[in-house]
Amino acid sequence: PAFGVFLNNKIYDLTYQLGSGVSSLKEAIHFDVLPDNNEELEEYLAHVTPYTLADVSFLPVIPDPGKILCIGLNYEKHRVETKRPESEFPTIFTRFPDSQVAHRESVIKPSVSERVDFEGELAVIIGKGGKNISESEAMETIIGFSCYNDVSIRDYQRHTSQFTPGKNFSKTGGFGPFLTIFMIIFRPIYNK
């Protein structure tokens, strides 16, 4: 497996540019070696031969995350339509890594289900761990964002008060295709 940068409809492999010991996007995030500004990115790309999108096979953005924490009922209209009461705290459930599927792979409808729903979500990828992180420092832990199809197997989701049973069938969580680096987008805001 490798990872790279998507720019001008080409993919540039960064795996070897970042040096030995960095063989995945997860490791690049852990070792904090991703380019965090356009100048640094251009320097990396000057030494890399690009691939076309047709040349590559995708994996989920982070195929082996440590945790996948999801926020349920994350907008008011959905909470109202499901007739759930207001809560002071968010509804949190987990997904397991083996429930993920990559870009261009098919989501698989479980044969035991009659009710499968698409749920387009924003994945927020945390790059720095920690404990007791203040609200003012929370944004600094984010490495980037991606698309996530949080497919719900509704009939199983409703078997209990927990969402987890309906969210973890194999190949039901489309993750990707790309990670958008937070600081490349928001650096101008933070530098003001």
List the predicted regions and their residue ranges.
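N-terminal non-catalytic cap/leader segment that marks the start of a structured domain
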Residues: 1-90
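Glycine-enriched loop-and-adjacent helix/strand subsegments that border the catalytic/binding cleft
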Residues: 65-192
